[in-house]
Amino acid sequence: MIVAHNLGFPRIGGQRELKWALESYWKEQLGQQELIQVTRELRALHWKQQQEAGLDLVPVGDFSWYDQVLDMSALLGVVPPRFGEIQDEVDLDTYFCMARGRAPGKKEVAACEMTKWFNTNYHYIVPEFQPQQAFRLASSTLFNQVAEAQALDFPIKPVLLGPLSFLWLGKSKGSTFDKLSLLDALLPVYGQVLHRLKTQGVEWVQIDEPILVLDLPPDWKAAFERAYSSLVNGGPKRLLATYFGALGDNTRLACQLPVEGLHIDLVSAPEQLAKVLDEFPSYKILSAGLVDGRNIWRNDLEASLAQLEALRERLDDRLWIAPSCSLLHSPMDLALESALDEELKSWLAFAVQKIEEVATLKRALVEGRDVVAQALADSAAAQASRRQSERIYRPEIRARMTEVNEDMTRRRHKYPVRAQVQREELKLPLYPTTTIGSFPQTPDIRKARRDFKAGRIAEPEYRRQMEAEIARAIQAQESYGLDVLVHGEAERNDMVEYFGEQLEGFAFTQNGWVQSYGSRCVKPPIIYGDVVRRQPMTVAWLRYAQSLTSRRVKGMLTGPVTLLQWSFVRDDQPRADTCLQLALVLRDEVRDLEQADIKLIQVDEPAFREGLPLRRVEWESYLAWAVRCFRVASSGVEDGTQIHTHMCYSEFNDIIHAIAALDADVITIETSRSDGELLAAFAAFEYPNEIGPGVYDIHSPVVPTEAQIVGLIKKAAEYIPAERLWVNPDCGLKTRAWPEVETALRTMVAAAHGLRSA
């Protein structure tokens, strides 16, 4: 039977109900039972939405309190010893403590590391494996959710992260050892999970093995056959799910594994289909991921249907239809958007619409095109409208792109010359202290922004309130003793949305939220057309901030690669072309800041690494245009203007040459959660410019001690000469509260002062 299904659904709710419930619980304003009830109601609603849209199977286990990888750590009993001994099951507060470093009723402890989920803007909590790691069933959450869905009579397909991907995504702690050596101990527990699902009456289980789209070492490839052969008996039928890219040289391996079904991503890698079909066995089900799970563009139903009709000829009823990946990366429901203009809205589809597209494709295939004729006609009209719209292409932007030359990608002189000029002009001390940019977004700030957008206060009053917040941030930083100040970004709701709102070619949603990590949600803008800057975007705020202090204030911009990566990007031209348009816009803004006497300008690129293709063979091309775009944005200034950049959550030891090629005068990086591991890159590669390794983890409310910060700086000094070291947090302080910010920054400044006088 041809089946319409889904790999995963957004968790947060149409009105971010999960976010508000979690944060109330963490503040002890909501009890645990009330939190559990909120999440139970959300799950039931989401299952109902998917079933009513026409799906034959709805996912269970895709919902998470915080993160699906952390869920697997809890399920399998992978709890680091510092969180205490787990007697029976991992309780909810231990779970939150692993993610955040604190939870109601728990003492503060270092949180587990957090990093990017493949090449997305979602973050997962990294499993920590000990050399003699024991595994056992330590959570009933998945089984309870299965029972919930069954009690409501939903047709279900539980979702698990596969054993090889779970090990691959974790880190060895303690002594260095091969994570793969843990597989034999892990597999019996997976077997228990599958057996228990079988006893619950589950017919199909989805096992996600996204690492099959990566370059895998031979021993990991060999482990797949061993692992899945051991899981053949005693469980439900297994659908092996891959996404975010092509199987490539893992195609034969994936096709021949002893499982009953295979899901492939035909949006990010449509070219892989022919090779998969060549290797595909006659007994196996193929799930075709034809609806884009990561972007917001409406599906071309005619094109997808033509592909499915050809597949049905080959596979008959062994064909399933699905989004390309989990809809975790998509906003919830386009119906919640009332402010988008109708033309643009007709080009879009969010999670609810995407499952409707999946169901429509299945109905067309099974019942005939006539049954869904209106849906097909609407889809065709939307495709034609988008191709023909005059709002997408701007001739003057196309002309400027052709004028970009190599001189526009180079500073006037190399770093050693620039550094001497900057030392003379900026007169900064050894171990200069600064922050990454944002300060706490208080309820008053958020209210002022809401009131201004809603028209409840006029622009002069809004500006007065924002200037008061800027003054507060400047005064606070002066009192802490920081050397280079920032204006605090009170006027910015989001580091991408703020800029996009001032650029033509961008559109914005009211409720297009997607989960970044835990309760943290982002609302990516939509880049639908050529990008144009109407006027300076940050100059007035920075000029005001600089007028309040004799110390230097850093300008703060979001870089072209990050603007690209953290937006929903048009798919009608190469991403490199869109990035160049963004770089040209930022080049103009950087020069305007310099003209306004802002002599330190930070161009943030926290998403630089996440743009990397998953296959290494494709890295060179990406890095070439990403570096070029950054340099176009940042190279139009005088030697005395110091260009900073910032990267967070980045493991970029293997792209350190590209990082150096950015030629930023100063780079600040995240190192605190990973115990400074990132600095090992500098043992083999002497980074030529200045660097600020983050000395405390802003994502955890735990404040470090002065001794801890001194230790991190001393460790950094083993790789970087002291005269090229900066002292800073590892990320912006937007999500923190002022009391903890004050304590942490005073401690950080004290550590720097102590080292100067040592």
Swiss-Prot record:
Binding locations of Zn(2+): 646, 648, 670, 731
Pfam families per the UniProt record, alphabetical: Meth_synt_1, Meth_synt_2
InterPro entries registered for this protein in UniProt: Cbl-indep_Met_Synth_N (IPR013215), Cobalamin-indep_Met_synthase (IPR006276), Met_Synth_C/arc (IPR002629), UROD/MetE-like_sf (IPR038071)
Superkingdom, natural source: Bacteria
UniProt: 5-methyltetrahydropteroyltri-L-glutamate binding residues: 16-19, 116, 520-521, 566, 610
Keyword NADP among record annotations: no
Reactions the enzyme catalyzes: 5-methyltetrahydropteroyltri-L-glutamate + L-homocysteine = tetrahydropteroyltri-L-glutamate + L-methionine
Active site as annotated: 699 (proton donor)
Binding site for L-methionine: 436-438, 489, 604
Pathway it works in: Amino-acid biosynthesis; L-methionine biosynthesis via de novo pathway; L-methionine from L-homocysteine (MetE route): step 1/1
Keywords: Amino-acid biosynthesis, Metal-binding, Methionine biosynthesis, Methyltransferase, Repeat, Transferase, Zinc
EC number assigned by the record: 2.1.1.14
Positions bound to L-homocysteine: 436-438, 489, 604
Any one of the GO BP annotations: methylation
Cofactor note: Binds 1 zinc ion per subunit.
Cofactor(s) named in the record: Zn(2+)
GO molecular function list: 5-methyltetrahydropteroyltriglutamate-homocysteine S-methyltransferase activity; zinc ion binding
Family recorded in the similarity comment: Belongs to the vitamin-B12 independent methionine synthase family.
Record function comment: Catalyzes the transfer of a methyl group from 5-methyltetrahydrofolate to homocysteine resulting in methionine formation.
Name under which the protein is recorded: 5-methyltetrahydropteroyltriglutamate--homocysteine methyltransferase
